[in-house]
Amino acid sequence: NNNNDYSNNNNNNTTNKKNNNNRNEASVASSNKKGDELAKKQVGKPVRKMTMPEYAAIMLYTSNAIYKDLNQALRDNNRLKVQKYFKYLRLFFESMSALPKQKMKLWRGMSVDLHQNPQYKVGNTVVWWGVSSCTSDVNVAKNFAKGCGGKCSIITIESETASDISDITFYSNEKESLLRPGTQLKVKSNKMNGNVCEITLQEVGTLIS
């Protein structure tokens, strides 16, 4: 019976990997197709001409195919895992550099209570090592917080270098902007409002240029 269970587990793992690969391949194909359309129109008012692969790199990030694993590798500073994404990251950084850097107020909803987190003590500077998705619509962040099922955090970000990708995404209703990996943010306030932790951060620099 144990051998049968082991065999079944292996079969299930193989099936899951195939399904994931199929989903990822479909996401890449969709991103390339959309990237081609965006490149023809030069959407997002880039500071230089953007190529189809550059648009596709941003589209792929918003497709949910890789962002969790990519950000986990970046946050863990796992060189082996990051190396897997090196070619993609190089293209992604090139695409981000082509988009105008904007000074704007953004919000981010997180399904974790950061009020007692020592990193988010007022006066501290935190570094976000992942690619950070934010929104220019506070209601998007609030709706995310409502759906987290417990204590959560709504972060207000006074950004200096955000890239507006609201027209370069599969989810245009989220009014999404991105902060680059290595963004440094100073904690200006941290308070509780009912079950919601409300934090204000001010962008003060970046560790990756």
Regions found by a protein language model. Name each.
Residues 1, 15, 21-26, 33, ...:
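Conserved NAD+-utilizing ADP-ribose enzyme module
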Residues 1-2, 107, 137, 187:
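Short low-polarity hydrophobic stretches
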Residues 2-9:
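Long, compositionally biased low-complexity repeat segments characteristic
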Residues 6, 14-15:
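Hydrophobic/aromatic hotspots within intrinsically disordered, low-complexity regions
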Residues 9-11, 39, 48, 113, ...:
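Intrinsically disordered, low-complexity, compositionally biased regions/tails
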Residues 11-12, 158:
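Low-complexity intrinsically disordered segments
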Residues 16-17, 64:
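Serine/threonine-rich, low-complexity intrinsically disordered segments
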Residues 24-168:
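Internal glycine-rich, Lys/Arg-flanked active-site/core loops of soluble domains
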